[in-house]
A protein has these predicted regions:
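Charged C-terminal helix
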Residues: 18, 69, 245-338
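Short pre-catalytic strand/loop immediately N-terminal to key active-site residues, enriched for Gly-Thr
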Residues: 24-30, 211-225
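Selective hydrophobic functional segments
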Residues: 63-108, 279-283, 288-293
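Conserved phosphate/ATP/ADP-binding segment of small-molecule kinases
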Residues: 131-210, 219
Length: 338
C-alpha cells in the first residue's frame, strides 16, 4: 500500500511521505516550460520533483536568445547524487541536448532496477518561439525509444522522429507504426497540431490496444508548457498507482482543466490591456486533481486485431479497470466520475 501523501511536521526528510519523480530537461528561465513547469505540475499533484538539468535556456514567451548545454559528466553527477538517497518512482525526460546526454541516460536507466522506474519521454525539439533544443542522431533516438516506457510526441515531433510527413489520419497511423517498429513500447501522440482534425484527438498505441482521447479545440489563447505538463501529470498519476489508461485519461483531463482555469482569466486581462490573444502565450495556473466532468475526454477503445470490439466511453463512464491502490487520489470508479 502506498504511503499517505502528507508531510509530518516532525519529519526531517521531505521524501519519506511523498513519492518522488525525477524531471530531466532544460531550465526555462521564464518558468513557462521545461523542468520548472514539470516541478510545478508534480507539486500540484502531490509529488516531490527532483530536477536533473540538461541545459540552461535564456528565453521568454516570444524568443530564445541562447542556450548552454550541460556536459554529460555533470548530468551523470546529478544522477549519482540523487540516486543515493532520493531514487525515483518515475522519470520524466524532456529536452535532451545531444547524443552524449541521451546515451548516458539510456545506460543509467537500463542499469536501474528493484524497482525500475516508469520512464516517460516527451521529445521536446524546440521552444514555442522556434529555438532548437535537441540535436539527436537517428541511432540514439532508436536507443531512447527502446529504453523508455512511453514516448509522447506532438505531430511535428512525430514527423521528426520518424522522418515521415504527418499530414492526415493515414500518415499519422503510419508514423506511429514506424515508432513501434523502431522499438517504442507505447506511443501517445498529442493532436493539438493536427490541422485536419475537427476536435483535438490524442492517440495512445501499445502492443495490445489503441485509445483515442477527444476534446473540443480550445481557441481562446495559447498556453505554454502543455506538453511538459501532460507528461509530468502522466508520471504523477502512474506513481499514484493508476494504470496507464487511467493515468493518461487523468493527465489529459488535468491539462484541459488547467487550460480552462487559466485562459479565460488571462484573456480577459489581455483584452483589458489591449494585448492580442494570438500573440500571448499564457502561464498555467495550478489546479490539483481534475474533478470537473467536462474536463475529461471522450475515450474510444480499440483492441488490436478485434475491430468488432471497439467501443466508446463517455465522460461519465471513463475507464473501469483502474489498478489504483489506496493512497492520495481515488480510483476513477470510486468518484462521481466513475
Amino acid at each position: 500500500m502506498m504511503a499517505k501523501a502528507s508531510i509530518s511536521p516532525a519529519s526531517n526528510n521531505l521524501t519519506t511521505a511523498i513519492p518522488v519523480v525525477w524531471c530531466v530537461g532544460g531550465v526555462d528561465c521564464s518558468g513557462g516550460a521545461g523542468v520548472t513547469r514539470d516541478a510545478i505540475t508534480l507539486a500540484d499533484l502531490n509529488i516531490h520533483a527532483c530536477v536533473l538539468t540538461t541545459q540552461l535556456t535564456v528565453q521568454s514567451n516570444s524568443i530564445m536568445l541562447s542556450k548552454e548545454s550541460m556536459c554529460a559528466s555533470a548530468l551523470n553527477q546529478q544522477w549519482q547524487v540523487l540516486f543515493e538517497d532520493t531514487p525515483p518512482r518515475a522519470i520524466k525526460i524532456g529536452a535532451i541536448a545531444n547524443d552524449e546526454q541521451a546515451l548516458l541516460l539510456c545506460a543509467r536507466i537500463q542499469k536501474t532496477s528493484n524497482p525500475r522506474p516508469f520512464v516517460v519521454w516527451d521529445p521536446v525539439l524546440s521552444t514555442s518561439s522556434g529555438g532548437v533544443l535537441s540535436e539527436l542522431s537517428e541511432s540514439v533516438v532508436d536507443e531512447l525509444l527502446n529504453t523508455v516506457d512511453i514516448v509522447t510526441p506532438n505531430i511535428d515531433e512525430l514527423a521528426w522522429l520518424t522522418h515521415l510527413p504527418v499530414v492526415d489520419e493515414a500518415s499519422l497511423l503510419t508514423a506511429i507504426n514506424r515508432l513501434r517498429g523502431k522499438g517504442a513500447k507505447s506511443v501517445y501522440v498529442k493532436g493539438g497540431h493536427a490541422h485536419w482534425q475537427k476536435n483535438v484527438s490524442d492517440i495512445f498505441v501499445c502492443a495490445s490496444h489503441t485509445l483515442r482521447f477527444s476534446q473540443p479545440k480550445y481557441a481562446n489563447g495559447n498556453l505554454r508548457g502543455t506538453g511538459c505538463m501532460l507528461a509530468s501529470a502522466l508520471a504523477a498519476f502512474i506513481v499514484h498507482d493508476y494504470c496507464i489508461e487511467d493515468a493518461l485519461t487523468l493527465a489529459n483531463a488535468y491539462v484541459s482543466e488547467v487550460r480552462g482555469h487559466t485562459l479565460p482569466k488571462q484573456c480577459a486581462a489581455a483584452n483589458a490591456n489591449a494585448i492580442s490573444n494570438e500573440l500571448t502565450a499564457y502561464f498555467a495556473r495550478t489546479n490539483g486533481f481534475p474533478a470537473k466532468p467536462e474536463s475529461f475526454p471522450l475515450v474510444t477503445f480499440h483492441q488490436r486485431g478485434a475491430t468488432a470490439n471497439e467501443k466508446e466511453r463517455d465522460k461519465d463512464t471513463l475507464l473501469e479497470a483502474s489498478s489504483c491502490k489506496e493512497g492520495h487520489f481515488p480510483a476513477l470508479t470510486h468518484t462521481h466520475l466513475g
